Amino acid sequence: EGGRMRMSPFKVSAISITFFPVRQRGVALISVLLIVAILVALSTQLLSNHNLVVSQHQNSFEQNQALQYAYGAEELARQLLFDDFSISGPGVDHLEETWAQAVLPFKLDDGGYLEAQVKDLNGCFNVNSLIGASGNDNLARLKRLFQSEDVDRGLADLIKDWVDIDQVTTGFGAEDNAYLGLTPPYRTANQPMRHISELFLLNNIEFEDISAILPHLCVIPSAANKVNINTASASFLYSLDAAVSIDAAQGVVESERSFLDVKSFIEANPEFEVVAPQLGVTSEYFEVHAKVQVGESTMSLASLFFRNTETGEVTLLQRDFAKFFQSKVVVDIDADS
């Protein structure tokens, strides 16, 4: 009024500030931390599962690679056996031929190594020859073989009782009654052996004994025991007859053995004339044994082949995986090199 200036009224909006109690703020912080912990746990679990899946795939891949390498070694041996027949001729087999040379361990591109060897099964004692009409004669031979290796002769009785069809204990052997008392209990096979690794099942047999006799024993799917004089070990040759001395057998092995016929062998080694009908210079049965390692995976494959003496055709009779592999060398591979 009059000379006074009149001020315009204005409104001030009220600002509402809410203060949480200390307890509520603590609960909120714990909730956040709990959520973070759950997320971390889930992430860790997912990462762990992922690593497990990757590891499983890696192991599966390495195992498959090892298997393929083993098959490759098997096929190479088959081809070598066929080439030996078709190129060198069917008349003779000896240890200087290509098939008899072991594939020494060598490194693989995928990391690891491969080793392979071919064993002539006509150059060793066929344990299945303990069955049949000549079983007792062959048992006596097996005992002489064990004697030459300083192994208990009673183990021969154990092997005979394992493969024969009866339950009559032979000498120091054992039938079902001895095995059923073991833990776990089991029975004798009472049938021909399928693989020489069955020796590990024999009652009270020691690993040292198996290591000593294994190079001289083999399994052929028949009771035949035809001996290839060009590939047989000294102990096996010595076992053939009491008239054969260990010195004579050792002399044969230490000579260059590539006899073309039994007649020339007998002329050079007359002590063997008594067993001439059981001797030969060719082989029909072979075992190819390969061991492969790829990464952390190891594969052992034993393959039994029969080679037809008329056509040279090589037939796969059976495969056995994870069998005992007796290497011919000691290998020390530096993974970083």
Residue ranges and their predicted role:
Residues 1-25:
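N-terminal leader/signal peptides at the extreme start of proteins
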Residues 2, 27-337:
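Compositionally biased linear targeting/interaction segments
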